[in-house]
Amino acid sequence: MARKKKKKHEDEHVDESWLVPYADILTLLLALFIVLYASSSIDAAKFQMLSKSFNEVFTGGTGVLDYSSVTPPENESDGIDEVKKEKEEKEKNKKEKEKAADQEELENVKSQVEKFIKDKKLEHQLETKMTSEGLLITIKDSIFFDSGKATIRKEDVPLAKEISNLLVINPPRNIIISGHTDNMPIKNSEFQSNWHLSVMRAVNFMGLLIENPKLDAKVFSAKGYGEYKPVASNKTAEGRSKNRRVEVLILPRGAAETNEK
């Protein structure tokens, strides 16, 4: 009887040798990602050292990381600077245009005041001057006040109201009213000093101006300087006459209300 051969069943063997290089590749990729991530938060010197170490460990020599830099490329840095420069230039041009428009508006107000002075034949009582602080309108005290008094004469109230119309500007500007005197001691019981007199003249004149419903009282302020800001010598009658005055300063837009003359 023939002997029945026993069937051999051999287990199939799967070749897994590819796993070793695959694992090495994953390790290298992980190391590369770690380096790239770390490079964003370390300085250039440390990055070069770390790069060199990884290249020596994994490749045994010079690699692509040896001469990399964490600083932005030169052309990228230039682009950022160019954008910043362009923005600053636009801002500068905008401010220059606003300043030019502001100056033009003040010049227009000055022209209107000068026309008013000419029409009213007040060349010896009022004058205008453009200064670095704004448009200055100077009014001699004799046009509104009696000597040593701070109340505007009744007959001159209409003139003060006409002047108020010249100050109607849209949008409103800050306006400072200041009183000034000569250095002659005041000789009445109403005021303790020239300083007190100058303050009250400024306040009373300002009060008449802001009775104009077209003017905003919030943009007005009053000051008194007494004899301490003369524009002429107090040694002559003519000089003292020039020093006795009320000034209206129309400020540039954006100027502080506390702007000192």
From Swiss-Prot:
The lineage of its organism: Bacteria, Bacillati, Bacillota, Bacilli, Bacillales. InterPro entries: Bact_OuterMem_StrucFunc (IPR050330), MotB-like_N_dom (IPR025713), OmpA-like (IPR006665), OmpA-like_sf (IPR036737). PANTHER family: LIPOPROTEIN YIAD-RELATED (PTHR30329:SF21), STATOR ELEMENT OF FLAGELLAR MOTOR COMPLEX (PTHR30329). Residues 1-19 are cytoplasmic. This is Motility protein B. Each stator complex is composed of 4 MotA and 2 MotB subunits. 2 A subunits and 1 B subunit are thought to form a single ion channel, so that each stator complex contains two channels. PROSITE patterns: OMPA_2. It is found in: Cell membrane. NCBIfam families: PRK07734.1 (NF005831). Keywords: Cell membrane, Chemotaxis, Flagellar rotation, Membrane, Transmembrane, Transmembrane helix. Residues 81-102 have a biased composition (Basic and acidic residues).
